[in-house]
Amino acid sequence: MPPFVINTAPLSSACAEWLEERVEVQHCDYRDEATLRGLFGRADGLVIATYLNVNDGLLDCAPRLKVVGRAGVGLEHVDLEACRRHDVRVVYTPQANCQAVVEYVFALMLDALRPRPLIEGPIDAERFFEWRRTEVGRQLDQLTLGVIGFGQIGRRVGAVARAIGMRLIVNDLLPEDQLRGEVDFPFEVVDKATLYANSDVLSIHVDGRAENRNLIGDVELAQLRPDCLVINAARGMVLDAGALARWAAATVETGGQAVLDVLEPEPPAADCPLFGLPNVRLHPHLAARTDTALEDMGWVVRDVWAVLQGEQPRFSAW
């Protein structure tokens, strides 16, 4: 009998077909708990995307499980210690969506700093020239980008910023000597207070570990420049939504802006304090959604198969 794998990720046809040639696959919606629980008992492998929680409760229902494949980067929904206790390997795709997220961050940045109204039909001269007078953006090579979390994505964001001509300041858990040994472009390592106080644009790239919940709240936001642009394409739980709403409301007149691709929870609750603020833009977690990134994330199935064959996977979380 071939191994049995449950898939809850949006695999491309190529990835799905590749897996189906090797194992028995059941494709399921991650929200269909009843169906999943009925299948866990015979599952040898599990492929997940963003939202399914892999914890002791799930693992206790899956005594045959050998491997969890995360089609993506973040592992905050996977309890790695629980997986170790149950002897379940965890594989993922840490490099798959970096380019997509970096491109998206700069798309958000340019949308916010370089406004560009659309001409969608006939327009009179007064409106046309009014736009030319009033729509004045900020030039990136005159700005300082602060990156908090200088990992794979943060570094690539920094590389693009430097290529454009932005000053780059960063804060990370790793020591400066190690960062400089791994990065070949100019940057300044600063403490968090200095980063907040000097950033024209603050781009957040920390991971979803528990210690990062509400990493940025009232105290941190109060240190920002009043015209700072805050971009979060990392994890929604990093930013205290209530604190951000207060900061945004206080900086409407001074040019403060926030653009969020991630929220806590997703989708946002009906009473989300960020709704209705003119200088806050919310997006539905799209940073990694390119055809290339989705394909590359889906190829986690290769490492799932490797573990099931008793081979060493390419990218293992433990």
Where are these regions (language model features)?
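NAD(P)-dependent dehydrogenase/reductase Rossmann-like domain
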Residues: 295-318
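N-terminal Rossmann-fold NAD(P) dinucleotide-binding loop
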Residues: 154-155
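Rossmann-like adenosine-cofactor binding region
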Residues: 54-57, 173-273
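Glycine-rich Rossmann-fold phosphate-binding loop(s) that bind the pyrophosphate
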Residues: 150-151
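An N-terminal-biased, well-structured beta-alpha scaffold segment characteristic
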Residues: 1-91, 217
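Phosphate-coordination loops involved in phosphoryl transfer and adenosine-cofactor binding
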Residues: 2, 65, 141-144, 227
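Adenosine-phosphate binding glycine-rich loop
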Residues: 268-269, 277-297, 303
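Phosphate-binding beta-alpha-beta segment of Rossmann-like dinucleotide-binding domains, i.e.
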Residues: 86-88, 94-144, 159
